[in-house]
Amino acid sequence: MQKQNIVILGSTGSIGKSTLSVIENNPQKYHAFALVGGKNVEAMFEQCIKFRPHFAALDDVNAAKILREKLIAHHIPTEVLAGRRAICELAAHPDADQIMASIVGAAGLLPTLSAVKAGKRVLLANKESLVTCGQLFIDAVKNYGSKLLPVDSEHNAIFQSLPPEAQEKIGFCPLSELGVSKIILTGSGGPFRYTPLEQFTNITPEQAVAHPNWSMGKKISVDSATMMNKGLEYIEARWLFNASAEEMEVIIHPQSIIHSMVRYVDGSVITQMGNPDMRTPIAETMAYPHRTFAGVEPLDFFKIKELTFIEPDFNRYPNLKLAIDAFAAGQYATTAMNAANEIAVQAFLDRQIGFMDIAKINSKTIERISPYTIQNIDDVLEIDAQAREIAKTLLRE
């Protein structure tokens, strides 16, 4: 079997590192062909030393220059590229077999679309591609013959729980025709699911980034605490699985053992379970339709004391309700919400605003954006930019 060339968009981030771990566990199957990052020279340098990719790219031009000099000094032949255009070209490289799209935020949008338009097999971990570009993105997947495989643990669990016919029609699967009645999205509820609401004003960034089950970056940890993460996943799930609002259900499951479920019309519920480790869904997408070793501890059922399920309280999680409503309002609203949330979360991490202010900034930003029908990527980027400016203005008010 010929080794698969993997391009990792966001190799220095949490998902990127987990992807490299799966590659390391399967050196006979996969090669880290190209590694892409932002400006973290040291992390990228270490990855290049260890995995010897053909290419390494950094968005920051100065950082790329430093990386190039360091690699030359150590006689590492990796070719270093810089800037967004080079990253988009790597995402569409003719020698690339699979693209791990895991750059966080709107920055990951163009490279991911570039991979789709090149007809690549895209392992999707970048939420923004669907949150901001849902219809455009799904249409591009179909028009360019790209293969989309969801990496997010919840969407991957849903994917694994669907019939093969649905797996082959991501974005266009007719759920009701295949006997599916509901998609159940599970979430841990974050670290504050039992915290009294009156204490929410005192929540610190340190408390918010300490996720009880998953190892994640700061931004996504805060999103998990506010359940914006689940809101974004709700939006993604509706696009990925062609699901109506009536075909969606969101449940809090504190143990994060069941990663999501699918209800069928005959009363069956099919679920995917496992230890909360992102290497499982990463390995599943890389090897699909086969399986490969991920290096994950097997689930020990005797250590699971209980599995509990709680209905989400929108007073506790206003961002979740906001995301559900934003999808109903249209693509402009989900794009604006996502952009505002990036600004608001960073402001919270920088101690400029309180924990409860994140949802307020997001909601007010959507209110101030004029309803607009998105027709192309430029429209998306325009609304994204507008929403960021509005959110920054709200921070100053």
Curated annotation (Swiss-Prot):
Give any Pfam family that matches: DXP_redisom_C
Q: Required cofactors, per record?
A: Mg(2+); Mn(2+)
Q: Which SUPFAM superfamilies does this UniProt record tie to the protein? A: 1-deoxy-D-xylulose-5-phosphate reductoisomerase, C-terminal domain, Glyceraldehyde-3-phosphate dehydrogenase-like, C-terminal domain, NAD(P)-binding Rossmann-fold domains
As one GO molecular function, the record gives: NADPH binding
One record GO biological process: isopentenyl diphosphate biosynthetic process, methylerythritol 4-phosphate pathway involved in terpenoid biosynthetic process
Residues binding Mn(2+): D152, E154, E233
Reaction(s) this enzyme catalyzes, per UniProt: 2-C-methyl-D-erythritol 4-phosphate + NADP(+) = 1-deoxy-D-xylulose 5-phosphate + NADPH + H(+)
Q: What UniProt keywords are attached to this protein's entry?
A: Isoprene biosynthesis, Manganese, Metal-binding, NADP, Oxidoreductase
Residues reported in the UniProt entry to bind NADPH: T12, G13, S14, I15, G38, K39, N40, N126, E128, G217
The UniProt similarity line reads:
Belongs to the DXR family.
Please give the PANTHER family that the UniProt record associates with this protein.
Answer: 1-DEOXY-D-XYLULOSE 5-PHOSPHATE REDUCTOISOMERASE, 1-DEOXY-D-XYLULOSE 5-PHOSPHATE REDUCTOISOMERASE, CHLOROPLASTIC
Role played? Catalyzes the NADPH-dependent rearrangement and reduction of 1-deoxy-D-xylulose-5-phosphate (DXP) to 2-C-methyl-D-erythritol 4-phosphate (MEP).
> What is the name of this protein?
1-deoxy-D-xylulose 5-phosphate reductoisomerase
Question: What organism does the record attribute this protein to?
Answer: Haemophilus influenzae (strain ATCC 51907 / DSM 11121 / KW20 / Rd)
